[in-house]
Amino acid sequence: MSDVSFHDLSSLDATQRSSLLKRAEADLSVFVEKVRPIIQAVKDEGDAALIRFARELDKANVAEGGLQVSEAEFDAAFDKVEKDVVESIGFGIDNIRRFHEEQKPETMWLKEVRPGAYAGDRYTPIASVALYVPRGKGAFPSVTMMTSVPAVIAGVPQIAIVTPPTSDGSVDAATLVAARLAGVHTVYKCGGAQAVAAVAYGTETVKPALKIVGPGSPWVVAAKSELSSIINTGLPAGPSEAIIFADDSVDGGLAALDLLIEAEHGPDSSAYLVTHSRKVAEAALAALPQHWSRMTEQRVEFSRAVLTGKRGGIVLTASLEDSYRFINDYAPEHLEILSKEPFAHLGHITEAAEILMGPHTPVTLANFVLGPNAVLPTSRWARTYGPLSVTDFVKRSSVGYVTSAAYPELAKHARRLARYEGFSSHENAVSEIRDRYLAG
């Protein structure tokens, strides 16, 4: 397919190469201006604003008093979803739970740093969190699974899902099934900027939360940015992105198959096949039409927009080292290492949020059922952030305990440093003044 973007990295100058790293980063300032009146309306009007915006923005008819999913709606969801899909949701949740249980930190640890002086950490769950589950380009029970399971494992006492309603005012049935199987029992029918505002400020129905996590549209991202001083907005998760890295040991047709996984998400996604093998690159190009013939019309449209645009296609490198360098510069959300010897490449990759190794580990498995979390940092934030985890739902407190035997030595050194930095009350608190109180 000659219209698929093909980038020979060795022929590009620094500016052209840098342009390949750009994502679909919307001008948030435009959206911030748009979300401000929405946020203010929700703050001032509560439920009435949510119902109005559901009608105006989501084209959904949510009845007054119907913003929270009822028990009857939860029960009905299991009848609406095919049994094999319910089974697969349960299978995925089981694996996600097994993986995330390993992340749960011990409640407290203490280290004796000096005889009689102890320092450590204590972990407690965040009191309340909101989980954002988008609906813009489809239904995503998988996002419900990925956000709900670690929150439940962390022991968060108040967990609520916010998700845009459908036109009849209901919530996607599979999303409700996933919520119930994961252990979440509160779901609110609101999405977009209005949902972020609702969980930040609270309404008559929606309880306020201390943190919100989950991917969303530019409207959601802008609302999170605007409300970041009110509610913790979690890791930056924007439009989906992936690199399929293939060496010369795999078929280019397989690389093309996996390239389309990310490209079909939407026209704002980013997806590259990176290889130093021209044979693999050409085979991938040749295989794309056959793969497109097996996709729905909408997903073909989405993936073609990505692969023929500025944020997708094939990147041919001069060597393996050049491939590694490009991948680390790009810092992808998802990285597949397509190779018969994937572990030989792993040590060269330092900047990727998710690394899936070998021809039997496509992104599809990780998105749904493998276990690692699929809510991941995008837009090169993999350089400083990691995947959503149990630790995103707990907070850490430092703990210190000093015995009477250890106190004098620590006090002596602390007193010297307090005096040097000019803090007289600090110094007094570990001086003979304290000794007199302790003795008396």
From Swiss-Prot:
Its EC number is 1.1.-.-. GO terms for molecular function: histidinol dehydrogenase activity; metal ion binding; NAD binding. SUPFAM superfamilies: ALDH-like (SSF53720). One of its GO terms (cellular component) is cytosol. Gene3D superfamilies: 1.20.5.1300, Nitrogenase molybdenum iron protein domain. Its cofactor is Zn(2+). The keyword Magnesium does not apply. It is an enzyme of class 1 (oxidoreductase). CDD domains: Histidinol_dh. The keyword Zinc applies. The active site is at E333, H334. Keywords: Metal-binding, Oxidoreductase, Zinc. Zn(2+) binds at H265, H426. GO terms for biological process: L-histidine biosynthetic process. Pfam families: Histidinol_dh (PF00815). Binds 1 zinc ion per subunit. Belongs to the histidinol dehydrogenase family. This is Histidinol dehydrogenase homolog 2. It comes from Mesorhizobium japonicum (strain LMG 29417 / CECT 9101 / MAFF 303099).
